[in-house]
């Protein structure tokens, strides 16, 4: 029997801002309550969807503290805490642990394009610097290079608190290798809402989701249906929401999902540069789908 710590429906939480660009902590608390009431399993602030590249260390720590306070004991808080400088990544990981995070999501170093041994040493040093679980985040589309399956598996076997991977490579050969060869208690999560159904069919453990910001009950329902073996139910959910999953990436994440949340009355539509609002034509396309789904 597996005892995987990371599983189910996790939301990659947006960071709401006021018009002056400061963090809207009142809206942040509302979002966390929204997920608590929806039954979301894990809330993950300060990731890509949370615009972490434009947050200061101090802002990230305060966001994590507020999210932990609002989540209480009903949801795990796994905070984004990654950087392409290993020393900085260690600092962020320690800050997240101190702020109350129960786990961290550590992105693969970007821009540097390290070797596989470099990836291994980076994640080893980060994991050994904290006492909480570490989730590796492999997202070649943003980082510019791939952490190979064997490197991830080596980390999973060698380092006790490396407990999961958010695998967003879209490489199903790599995904199957991770699922088939992993240690028993190591979780494999997808980072792609549109791939939830096939990913779970292969034996995946869940999703770290963008769409859960808008439709947390839907995402949890799809994951739970797949876990229970209710394939037809999961297919029906996927069929209904597949276009929304795709339109959330009609422009760079998190711009579309934040626009949607603003239409839903949950946050103001404010981004930090270099992110800017969507083109009007794309706004119209996304709004039409939200209206079709009765979300606005």
UniProtKB/Swiss-Prot annotation:
Cellular component, GO, one term: cytosol
Keyword terms, alphabetized: Amino-acid biosynthesis, Cytoplasm, Diaminopimelate biosynthesis, Lyase, Lysine biosynthesis, Schiff base
Gene3D superfamilies (UniProt xref): Aldolase class I
Amino-acid positions noted as binding pyruvate in the UniProt annotation, renumbered to this chain: 49, 208
Site (Part of a proton relay during catalysis): 48, 111
Pfam families: DHDPS (PF00701)
Reactions catalysed: L-aspartate 4-semialdehyde + pyruvate = (2S,4S)-4-hydroxy-2,3,4,5-tetrahydrodipicolinate + H2O + H(+)
Associated pathway: Amino-acid biosynthesis; L-lysine biosynthesis via DAP pathway; (S)-tetrahydrodipicolinate from L-aspartate: step 3/4
Subcellular location: Cytoplasm
GO molecular function: 4-hydroxy-tetrahydrodipicolinate synthase activity
SMART domains, sorted: DHDPS
Enzyme class: lyase
Main location: cytoplasm
Active-site residues, record numbering mapped to chain: 137, 166
EC number: 4.3.3.7
BP GO terms, sorted: diaminopimelate biosynthetic process; lysine biosynthetic process via diaminopimelate
Family, similarity comment: Belongs to the DapA family.
Job description of the protein: Catalyzes the condensation of (S)-aspartate-beta-semialdehyde [(S)-ASA] and pyruvate to 4-hydroxy-tetrahydrodipicolinate (HTPA).
Complexes and interactors: Homotetramer; dimer of dimers.
Name of the protein described by the UniProt record: 4-hydroxy-tetrahydrodipicolinate synthase
Organism for this UniProt entry: Chlorobaculum tepidum (strain ATCC 49652 / DSM 12025 / NBRC 103806 / TLS)
